[in-house]
């Protein structure tokens, strides 16, 4: 299986140097992962998966203070030999989750500053029932972030100094610093829990 798997990061050469860490688990390092937004994981065509099997694809961001934690991205199979995965928001989500992702590739792996892609060969029927855990959270986070930025930019476009203000007893004014404080607090809460607004 070593030469049967490949990874492409935008603007980089194809990587096929997976390392086998167990009979059914393979890892590859992604250097300078902060500059990577999407990865393509694929079968090279040299060796197909065994009948009924597929490759679960996991991603791990580096954490200098802890062993790798793995986030399920999706899977590839003989009938779906490649997949594109968005990873740009996974680092933020991993930090927010306080490393709640499962360490499926062993607890004894050394701490790494290089991101990794892991492929675990598993029954395809099991993988078809799984969905990436970060999809909904990622969408909420992105929507909330864009909405707050849009609101802040809109309000800021109307800012004037006190000397430019026209007295109007029927108009209420809010200092821009108050909006800035709200914006900062909202962003912090959104990073801690993208679904906080539901409660």
Curated annotation (Swiss-Prot):
GO terms for biological process: protein import into nucleus. It comes from the Eukaryota. Pfam families: Hikeshi-like_C, Hikeshi-like_N. InterPro entries: Hikeshi-like_C, Hikeshi-like_N, OPI10. One of its GO terms (cellular component) is nucleus. One of its GO terms (molecular function) is Hsp70 protein binding. Belongs to the OPI10 family. This is Protein OPI10 homolog. The lineage of its organism: Eukaryota, Metazoa, Ecdysozoa, Arthropoda, Hexapoda.
């Amino acid at each position: 299986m070593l030469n049967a798997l490949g990874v492409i990061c935008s603007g980089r050469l194809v990587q096929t140097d997976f390392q086998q860490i167990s009979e059914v688990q393979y890892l590859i390092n992604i250097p300078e992962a902060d500059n990577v937004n999407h990865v393509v994981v694929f079968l090279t065509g040299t060796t197909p998966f065994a009948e009924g099997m597929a490759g679960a694809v996991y991603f791990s961001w580096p954490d200098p203070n802890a062993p790798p934690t793995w986030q399920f991205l999706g899977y590839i199979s003989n009938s779906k030999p490649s997949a594109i995965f968005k990873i740009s928001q996974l680092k933020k989500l991993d930090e927010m989750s306080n490393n709640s992702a499962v360490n499926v590739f062993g607890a004894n792996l050394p701490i790494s500053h290089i991101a990794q892609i892991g492929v675990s060969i598993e029954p395809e029927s099991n993988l078809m029932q799984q969905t990436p855990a970060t999809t909904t959270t990622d969408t909420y986070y992105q929507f909330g972030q864009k909405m707050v930025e849009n609101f802040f930019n809109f309000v800021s476009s109307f800012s004037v100094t006190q000397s430019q203000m026209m007295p109007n007893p029927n108009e209420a004014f809010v200092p821009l610093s108050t909006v800035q404080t709200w914006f900062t607090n909202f962003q912090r809460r959104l990073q801690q829990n993208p679904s906080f607004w539901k409660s």
